[in-house]
Amino acid sequence: MFKKNRWFWIVAVIGLILDQVTKYITVQSFEQIGDTFPIIPGVFHFTYVINTGAAFSAFRGGVGWLKWLSLLVSLGLMAFAYFGPHLNRWEQLAYGFILAGAFGNGIDRFLFGYVVDFLDFRLINFPVFNLADVFINIGIICLLISTFPHKSRVP
């Protein structure tokens, strides 16, 4: 059924599972919001926070339209991969990662009204984020790579 754009579906499903499992583990492992566990003290911690905004805490403060944007992007990407053209490998990876991130954070927004974040790079004082945010950024990088000219294979 999903033979066309197979890598899109594989990346999206695996990414979504990883995102949701890591968020679940975070919620179950910490007693309260704000608790932290240093992996490399002062550099990288697992810190349990909730985020009512977008990636990397942009638009903080309960922006309700983000859940609808996540849903629209997710449905649009799935329709494009299923009904649209056969995508090259980089495009499949790109859109699969973006779907995993958008759908993962979208699920959280619809169920809880916020997203669970836990990756805390303190060395550079960066906002706490999650795997869905990482996947969206990896997807954007893959999409940029897909625009580079590639040599075609000689049969």
Curated annotation (Swiss-Prot):
Its main location: membrane. It comes from the Bacteria. Signal peptide: none annotated. The chain crosses the membrane at residues 7-27, 39-59, 63-83, 96-116, 126-146. The keyword Transmembrane helix applies. Keywords: Aspartyl protease, Cell inner membrane, Cell membrane, Hydrolase, Membrane, Protease, Transmembrane, Transmembrane helix. GO terms for molecular function: aspartic-type endopeptidase activity. It catalyses: Release of signal peptides from bacterial membrane prolipoproteins. Hydrolyzes -Xaa-Yaa-Zaa-|-(S,diacylglyceryl)Cys-, in which Xaa is hydrophobic (preferably Leu), and Yaa (Ala or Ser) and Zaa (Gly or Ala) have small, neutral side chains. Pathway: Protein modification; lipoprotein biosynthesis (signal peptide cleavage). It is a multi-pass membrane protein. PROSITE patterns: SPASE_II. GO terms for biological process: proteolysis. Its EC number is 3.4.23.36. NCBIfam families: lspA (TIGR00077). Belongs to the peptidase A8 family. This is Lipoprotein signal peptidase. It comes from Microcystis aeruginosa (strain NIES-843 / IAM M-2473). The lineage of its organism: Bacteria, Bacillati, Cyanobacteriota, Cyanophyceae, Oscillatoriophycideae.
